[in-house]
């Protein structure tokens, strides 16, 4: 047993009695479930920290570019030594950083709330939340219309090898 695994198991063993003492449902959960929820929490907290860093960076870069005129200088004309291309590049980069960090925070927070760890689980969760299983059962009970049955039979014939592509059914020689 490695040192990391030993420290993790001792950490988990100290956590379970605490959770059970205060009647948390998580106290009855398995170690894998607790580790999974911990990973989801760490992802969310990391993206939240990145969002805080990005917003602070955007604030500082905005304040540093603010035009403050001297005492007897007009406040309507910016200085002539101003580089608009650099300002635009910094604005695009800062906006992209803010958008990405806030989006990651929303996504990881939603996944933490919904207990989703991968794309397959996300698909299952969305299908069950939107009533996909019930609607699928209702659709399977409905009778199939004539055109859909014809297309389905044709596709089944192709998949089973019953259809000959060389023979098109028309007589070209006559």
Curated annotation (Swiss-Prot):
It is a multi-pass membrane protein. InterPro entries: AIM11. It comes from the Eukaryota. The chain crosses the membrane at residues 42-59, 88-110. The keyword S-adenosyl-L-methionine does not apply. Keywords: Membrane, Transmembrane, Transmembrane helix. It is found in: Membrane. One of its GO terms (cellular component) is mitochondrion. Belongs to the AIM11 family. This is Altered inheritance of mitochondria protein 11. It comes from Scheffersomyces stipitis (strain ATCC 58785 / CBS 6054 / NBRC 10063 / NRRL Y-11545) (Yeast). The lineage of its organism: Eukaryota, Fungi, Dikarya, Ascomycota, Saccharomycotina.
